Amino acid sequence: MPWTGIFSLSAVTKKKMKTGSQKAVWGRGYMKIAYKAFRPDLSCQAGGSTYQYQLQKWNEIKEAKCRETGFHCAEDPLDCLSYYPVWEQAVYYMVAADGDIDEDACDSKIACTRLRLLKKMTKEAYIYVALVYMVQHPTRNWNANVKRERAVADRNQMAVSRGKNPAAKGGLGAVLGLAKETPDGCGITDIAVCVVDGKRYLPDVFYDVNGNEVLI
């Protein structure tokens, strides 16, 4: 399934089912699929010191408590940007969180004692899974990177717009995410991911969730 395009909720459901199968394969007990940002060499702070994460294995630590100890990740991909806000200076992964798990009461952060890196995320994939998170949890607090109705991204950056009639624009190379809500509630009816390529999607032009130009 491509990461860019106009998505029906049936497609989102299929993607959710695929993620669920990963839980069955990788999990040992109460496991969650989440997202984590790292330095380019896959190192990150863990328990007050720098930890070097490894691919293709379970990384393990003794204790997990949010904001204090353990490996930290987030259910909402966009929460990772609070800690590593510059895409070009970090790498972002889908991860499996397992072992002892502690969840934060403030945002979607998770602390765990076992963590496995599953998939490195492109910008397009990252915005897509962020939109899927909104579909699955429409009433949860919005990440600060999600803008109501209108969002704007600089060249090669990202923007996410959510609302009754969301629209977004960006410079060349920007990735735009859109989530349309129900007329009388906060549930999500449609999502879209668009890359400003200078051909199908033009720089500094607002687009709606159907990929159509919007005059604002």
Segments predicted by a language model, with ranges:
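Short, glycine-biased loop/turn motifs at secondary-structure junctions and
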Residues: 2-216
